[in-house]
Amino acid sequence: LNDIRIPHDWGLEIGILSEMYRNFANNKICQVDIADTYEHKHQEISKNNRQKGLSKMTMDISKALFRKLATQGHVFSNEKFRSLKATYYRLALDMVQIYKTDAEMNGLIFDVHKEEEMVELFAQNIIEAGKIFLESPSENPNIPTWRRVDSADPSILRSFKEAVMEDNS
């Protein structure tokens, strides 16, 4: 785990997953629950501010995916991002219909208009995240690896261990 690069934004999960696939064989990877309960952070949509809420979340996750795919040799362009947007948009609208039907069968209320507005926002965010990705190729949202931290301060891991031992005694 010393070489895992961990994003510090909403790309955390996809970033860690792709790092695990990069560093370990598939048969060495599994998902585990680290808590009995998990509090999901419900976010506002934030249509008018891409730096907040679900809008920021979709931007960060999109950029994380683009960065990881680029490290595997995928080449991106404005045209590629337009194709990704179109593909996402069509599939997402299909899913809205599936969820609407499922909700109706279960007697639940489902606001198609609101869901499709979110699909439109998220589709546009793919384009915006793509622009940022192309304009800022050196953007790095990752915290340093433990190997780098240890190299910068060889005593830090020992200090962490001592602090944990002290807390637990």
Language-model-derived ranges and their functions:
Residues 8, 17-37:
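Catalytic donor-sugar/metal-binding loop of nucleotide-sugar-dependent glycosyltransferases
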Residues 1-3:
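Conserved nucleotide-sugar donor-binding
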Residues 38-39, 43-169:
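Terminal low-complexity segments of carbohydrate-biosynthetic enzymes
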